[in-house]
Amino acid sequence: MNYQAMMKVLVSEAVRIATFPFRILPIRKNRILFTGLTGGRNYDYSCNPKYLYEYMRDHFPGQYEYVWAVSDCEKYRFLEEEGVKLIRHFAVSSFPMLLTSKVIVTNGSYAPWFPFRKKQYVINTWHGGGAYKKVENGRPDADWATKKRAEFCAHNIDLFVASCKIQEKEMIQKTFCYKGEVVRAGTPRNDRLVNGDIGDMARKVRSHYHIPEDGKVVLYAPTYRNPSEPVVFDSDLILSRLQSGVCSGLLAEHQNDTGKWYFMCRFHRYQEPDGPIRVKGEHILNVADYPDMQELLCAADVLITDYSSCVWDYGFLNKPCFLYVPDKQEYMKLTGFYVNVNEWPFGQAQTMQQLVDLLCTYNADEQKEAFHQHLERLGSYETGESCKQIAAYICKNCN
């Protein structure tokens, strides 16, 4: 039995009773509340809600009242300069704001645990594109409490945002048992990636970490998991091979560059520092606390991950992407995939030497074509206008 999930079910019922007195407060038709789940109990100014908010702010100035529910209000005081009201995620003091906002935009499991009112409008953008690893309640070992949590989620949501056809069918409708309206808009955080508007995002990251203009970045971003055997990534080996020039074909536009390579590592927030996913090496930039994964992707010249949905986002940049998956068979058995990992359009390695070989034999045209076919197979809904489409739903429900 997943006791944590069971406790959340019980807590949600308790909250439903505790918030009853607040229901006499009128709903503010122009109030929009955003919240972005970033892992565990962390809620930040991030992910799809962030990009949707910025679109609304820029295209509808002065028309709406914006609220952000975050874990640490002090981190985001700059939003108050834009007129945003900050509330602490799930603090009792936040309940009146939660129950009087006309539209609530979340990217994950915020919605299931709060008894929103029937006249409120809850949008779930989700926090991953494509259709890759199965979500918790869709896995073979999912228990009653975990599945019950998914039912709460489906019941509370009025509009679910889908990035592709397979995600809509297999995750949204099948795993979550969601029967409501789906907007086939793609993901707000990918609009700029799809449109190629990434220059300032990349420069922001490079400036933050003092990476020179001719510097090149490889980003390692493993997803959360607990394999039976440690997964150890040798960053020094990768950097030495890249710096030596033996993989000169990896970045065609940099073939004659002599700039230094930098290794960035971003662990999932669930992953313990001394856990089974490890990186060894002397020159590692830990970017786990950087607030925006999309900006990191824009700054990276090469991405190495495993089962993360960031491959969907990064694919639109037409840059080299590889999967380091020494625990692939175990992960397939314990977690599973909506689309078999062996059919993903990126080179896969189960040893460090295999990864080096992939780096040195990379063919940009082949990966670009493979990703294009992948988008067709999954039925991509990404057009670069996700924010515009979802904003139309928000405006309609706020008027």
Specify the residue positions occupied by each region the protein language model found.
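C-terminal amphipathic helix plus adjacent low-complexity
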Residues: 1-2, 198, 352-399
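Membrane-proximal basic amphipathic "stem/tether" segments
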Residues: 1-40, 47
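Short, charged/polar "capping" segments at the starts of alpha-helices
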Residues: 44-45, 72-79, 168-171, 228-229, ...
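Catalytic binding pocket for nucleotide-activated donors in carbohydrate/polymer assembly enzymes
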Residues: 309-378
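Conserved catalytic-core segment of nucleotide-activated headgroup transferases in glycan assembly
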Residues: 44-54, 58, 188-277, 349, ...
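A donor-sugar binding/catalytic signature common to diverse glycosyltransferases
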Residues: 104-126, 130-133, 289-334
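Active-site and donor-binding regions of nucleotide-sugar-utilizing enzymes
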Residues: 32-197
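Donor nucleotide-activated moiety binding/catalytic core segment of transferases
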Residues: 87-102, 269-312
